[in-house]
Amino acid sequence: MKTTTTKHRGDAAEDAALDYLRDAGLLLLARNYRTPGRGGGEIDLIMRDPRGSSGGTLVFVEVRQRSAGTHGGAGGSITGMKQRRIVFAAQHYLSRLRVVPPCRFDVVLVEEKITWLQGAFDAG
């Protein structure tokens, strides 16, 4: 039952992050995008930020939620391995596009309040 509870909390955090980003003007393109096969990656939200260059910026969003601030809180749970998996999934997503737009990797922390970290990490 704990898995179900954890999944429900994760889904609720993603819903809250999605609402927050939509209110900021971003547009949802995909949710829970997964690469095929084992060992791939997943991206919680893929959005487009229409501000800036023509066509906007493609935004790959990782949503993290922790009820307790221990162990670095929600932000402390984004390890280098997790970042590499997100980048791998983003590369897979981009390989399907004819034209690759500007991109960035954001993180939304859902704790007592929502914190949006734009450009939280890069693909390098």
How should these model regions be labeled?
Residues 88-96:
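A short, N-terminal amphipathic alpha-helix
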Residues 40, 56-60, 102, 114:
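Structural motif
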Residues 43-69, 86:
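Conserved catalytic cores of phosphodiester-cleaving nucleases, focusing on short active-site segments
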Residues 1-33:
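Acidic-basic catalytic patches of nuclease active cores, encompassing PD-(D/E)XK
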Residues 6-10, 14, 39, 78-83:
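Short, conserved glycine- and acidic-residue-centered signature motifs
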Residues 96-124:
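Domain-level recognition of nuclease-like catalytic cores that cleave nucleotide substrates
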Residues 67-89:
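Mg2+/Mn2+-dependent nuclease catalytic core
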Residues 27-55, 124:
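Active-site metal-binding core of divalent-cation-utilizing nuclease and nuclease-like domains
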